[in-house]
Amino acid sequence: MEGPASSKPLKDKTNPWGPLIILGILIRAGVSVQLDSPHQVSNVTWRVTNLMTGQTANATSLLGTMTEAFPKLYFDLCDLMGDDWDETGLGCRTPGGRKRARTFDFYVCPGHTVPTGCGGPREGYCGKWGCETTGQAYWKPSSSWDLISLKRGNTPKDQGPCYDSSVSSGVLGATPGGRCNPLVLEFTDAGRKASWDAPKVWGLRLYRSTGTDPVTRFSLTRQVLDIGPRVPIGSNPVTTDQLPLSRPVQTMPPRPLQPPPPGAASIVPETAPPPQQPGAGDRLLNLVDGAYQALNLTNPDKIQECWLCLVSGPPYYEGVVVLGTYFNHTIALKEKCCFYADHTGLVRDSMAKLRKRLTQRQKLFESSRGWFEGSSNRSPWFTTLISAIMGSLIILLLLLILLIWTLYS
């Protein structure tokens, strides 16, 4: 009988370059993140869309950074209701319908994060009470985690019929398009920190004392466009001189054209030494000093107590930080490129004081660490050696235990 065929060993299909490829991708991603400056200005467009009709309620574009481009968005409630909303006659087709919409409270429920029991699009994500996170109602709905707040604008309720000024220009209180239900959308702190890579949806319902509250849905989208091709930024000519200045060249006195008469003292004309070129530190300090002079002439009230800072990364903006309770800017910039200024001028000792504080912090940090952590940071091979020795000892101990168990068994 023919025996079974001998099985061939499986070929290792592991790519030997796999770890290196993954490491390269991670390094490239890390470099791209570091080069992405938070001060980069882009063209940011926010768009509010009525998902029931597909019409745009608001489209606001502005130039700003990704951390600051969060404007207030203004639109009208009728942009979300439409001309005919439900079978009861609610809608914004007529001036009377627009005026009637002003008498209702409304509440908003998030569709990007739907809590349990809040339903789906049909219920406007407001399937039960407690799902609402914002709105304009007598119970003042609010939330600490939602991304936006939506409130009514400043139009008084006694404005009168909402006539279109292009049709009824002689009617008191007429507005362009008959818009008399202004809404104001603002971003919360959570909204400023959230990711807006995809549209986010909310449901809005009018509150009625009887019957079912009508539903509409809207989305909020952010579109980011580059303001133009990025020109490669070379080295700053101000900071090219990074090496210490060389010693001044010894100037030799000019040789007299004719020898002096016997017994007369030789007269050597005095020559002025060549002017020394300012170093990189002096040039950077002159930039900050120039910014201070410009501020002192244009807005002297802004420099009563302020920090002038140079940002080290592109696009090389020069920032003016005014002291206040807004944010600890010196900690954010690691206190390495800030100079204190007031009406007396730029304090040139600020950098030395900051370096001293940084040195003290570093010493305090090193003193608070244990001896093992400090040794491992100073000598990376020490950690590798300890790990190898400990691993060998553990293996020997296991083998010894196994040998003793075998002998006694």
Swiss-Prot record:
Q: Where is the signal peptide?
A: 1-32
Q: Where is the composition biased (Pro residues)?
A: 251-263
Glycosylation (residues) = N43, N58, N296, N328
> What quaternary arrangement does the UniProt entry report?
Homooligomer. Forms heterooligomers with mouse EPOR, probably via their respective transmembrane domains. Forms covalent heterodimers with mouse MST1R isoform sf-Stk, probably via disulfide bonds.
Alphabetized UniProt keyword annotations: Disulfide bond, Fusion of virus membrane with host cell membrane, Fusion of virus membrane with host membrane, Glycoprotein, Host cell membrane, Host endoplasmic reticulum, Host membrane, Host-virus interaction, Membrane, Oncogene, Signal, Transmembrane, Transmembrane helix, Viral attachment to host cell, Viral envelope protein, Viral penetration into host cytoplasm, Virion, Virus entry into host cell
Question: Which organism does this record belong to?
Answer: Friend spleen focus-forming virus (strain Lilly-Steeves)
One Pfam family named in its UniProt record: TLV_coat
UniProt subcellular location: Host endoplasmic reticulum membrane; Host cell membrane; Virion membrane
The keyword Transferase appears for this protein? no
What InterPro entries does this protein's entry cite? FMuLV_rcpt-bd (IPR008981), TLV/ENV_coat_polyprotein (IPR018154)
Virion surface topological domain: 33-384
Q: What does this protein do?
A: This envelope-like membrane glycoprotein is responsible for ligand-independent activation of the erythropoietin receptor EPOR leading to the abnormally rapid proliferation of erythroid precursor cells. In the first stage of Friend disease, constitutive activation of EPOR by gp55 causes uncontrolled, polyclonal proliferation of infected erythroblasts, leading to polycythemia (massive increase in the number of mature red cells). Host susceptibility to SSFV-induced erythroblastosis depends on the expression of the truncated isoform of MST1R receptor tyrosine kinase (MST1R isoform sf-Stk).
Q: Where are the transmembrane segments?
A: 385-405
- A cellular-component GO term for this protein: membrane
Q: Which Gene3D superfamilies match?
A: 1.10.287.210, ENV polyprotein, receptor-binding domain
Leftover remarks: Compared to other gammaretroviruses which possess 2 envelope proteins (gp70 and p15E), gp55 corresponds to a gp70-p15E fusion protein with a deletion of a portion of p15E. It is encoded by the defective env gene of the virus. The Friend murine leukemia virus complex induces a rapid and fatal erythroleukemia in adult mice. It is the replication-defective spleen focus-forming virus (SFFV) contained in this complex that causes foci of proliferating erythroid cells in spleens of infected mice. The second component is a replication competent Friend murine leukemia virus (F-MuLV) that serves as a helper virus for SFFV.
Q: Where is this region: Disordered?
A: 232-280
- The residues on the Intravirion side of the membrane are 406-409
Q: What is its main location?
A: host cell
Q: Which GO terms describe its biological process?
A: fusion of virus membrane with host plasma membrane; symbiont entry into host cell; virion attachment to host cell
Q: How does it sit in the membrane?
A: Single-pass type I membrane protein
Nuclease recorded as keyword: no
- Please give the name of this protein: Glycoprotein 55
